[in-house]
Amino acid sequence: LTTINKFFENSLNVSETSRQLYIHRNTLVYRLDKLQKSTGLDLRVFEDAITFKIALMVAKYMKYMESLDY
């Protein structure tokens, strides 16, 4: 998730994200491709990135609600 969060922080900019993560640009592209194969969402496409971001927010909210249930 660190890679994904950093990618979102950098407005889906592959070059800047890879620089900040101290990884080669192709490594980041490989990670994004791997995520695309497992989810069907390409985070380099804005609509897919928004869908994924919303899914992360929902998952975080559900985890929070579970913690309130004891």
Language model feature labels by segment:
Residues 1-70:
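Cytosolic nucleotide-utilizing catalytic cores of signal-transduction proteins
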